[in-house]
């Protein structure tokens, strides 16, 4: 049974979340049901908007190599008790009430792999530019 958390999610936390498929008549690629999620939105957004951006983990074997799927062994990340894959292209927005209390958190070393995969998924994050409309992550 899923129990919603009362604390405001913080970036880097791993929380279980419940996502329902509101468009149940359509075939979607959203991860529905209860899954562990990595919180990736900033703390100010999480606090003021009542929602946060998350990336789902799955324990299913994905098969072929994909640069935006990051595999973690059980225990490699505090809070993951099974081998898991972080699915970068599954990034979604959930309401804070759809997330449990934190079950783990990412370290600096874990973030490096996520940032590199995000650059592959969103190539505009790699561009060096003086244009203020382009976001640069170095």
PLM region spans:
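Compact nucleic-acid interaction/catalytic patches
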Residues: 26-76
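A broad, low-specificity signal marking well-ordered, structured residues that form hydrophobic/aromatic
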Residues: 15, 52, 70, 85-86
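Short, surface-exposed secondary-structure edge patches
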Residues: 2-8
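C-terminal terminal-subdomain/extension
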Residues: 7, 72-138
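Short, charged beta-turn/beta-strand-edge "cap" motif at the junction between a beta-strand
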Residues: 20-25
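Loop/turn positions that initiate beta-strands
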Residues: 9-14
